[in-house]
Amino acid sequence: MLKTTIIGASGYTGAELALMVEKHPELTLAGLYVSANSTDAGKCISQLHGKLAGVIEMPVLPLTDPLGVAQDSDVIFLATAHEVSHDLAPLFLQQGCQVFDLSGAFRVKGDDFYTQFYGFAHQHSEWLDKAAYGLAEWNEEAIKASQLVAVAGCYTTAAQLAIKPLLISQLVDTNQWPVINATSGVSGAGRKASMTNSFCEVSLQPYGIFNHRHQPEIVHHLGCDVIFTPHLGNFKRGILATITMKLQDGVTKEQVAHAFAQAYDRKPAVRLKGDVIPRIQDVEFTPFCDLGWRVQGQHIIVISAIDNLLKGASSQAMQCLNIHYGFSPLTALL
């Protein structure tokens, strides 16, 4: 059994991970931790997340001795802020732990990227270079080999799973940039209360126009420019992305369908719906990405639906763990 520790366990993604670890036949939950100054420190996780009552009755402890935690852990999940993951990941890695980081701290190679888009100077370029990008369906070999897996972002997962098959098959005319309009539930902003996310204030609206940090992450890993506009939806969880692309001259519906089928053959976390339009309702509380599409003339619209807390975060992290250790990819996820 792999001794597994979750740092940042009080948040939504941390709680989802705790439940997955508890269900996993090859993992044992070694500890749940939050930052030393967190108001959640010392509370039972079932007190913070009622759905875990009777399932996990373990205290969420303040992280005051990271080296001690590392010595008692085989696997570390970091469900922490970007800067916190940046500082903690190298410490755990140096102690021999396998690390799955759900933040953006190691997703994009290039130190100046973090200064520009995350507001801090990256100090660990050696680990940045070694990190595997955790887009599970598209990076299995690197995930198997790397001690550090930087789990892909939520919007970036929904977008890339929809675009990559067509891009790899050279069916897209990239002279016209793919246009991604994606709407996320309020849980994407985390558990901390804010006026914008409060019940009476939350409203469907775009945000981060031209400057959302997932845009350069998408561009970096796709290898082509995109226009990305995220939206805040007045619902709890899920992402629905609607992506418009121009196809190369002469591309047929059959070629499009073949590209998706070829890309996701034996990839059980991606469900191809064809001309059936995906819905958040069908993917929330699941580890799946549903993809549907329609072709008209030279244009295609692809719809991608995921649960932002699961396929967009925790279940993808666990999927990466399963890939790394050679377990069935959806172990503990269904």
Curated annotation (Swiss-Prot):
Query: Which SUPFAM superfamilies does the record associate with it?
Result: Glyceraldehyde-3-phosphate dehydrogenase-like, C-terminal domain (SSF55347), NAD(P)-binding Rossmann-fold domains (SSF51735)
According to the lineage, what is the superkingdom? Bacteria
- Which Pfam families does the record cross-reference, listed alphabetically? Semialdhyde_dh, Semialdhyde_dhC_1
Show the active-site residues: C154
From the UniProt annotation, give the residues forming the signal peptide.
none
* Enzyme category, top tier: oxidoreductase
Q: Name one GO cellular component term.
A: cytoplasm
GO process annotations (BP): L-arginine biosynthetic process
Q: Where does it reside?
A: Cytoplasm
- List the protein's name: N-acetyl-gamma-glutamyl-phosphate reductase
Q: Which organism is it from?
A: Vibrio vulnificus (strain CMCP6)
Q: Which gene encodes it?
A: argC
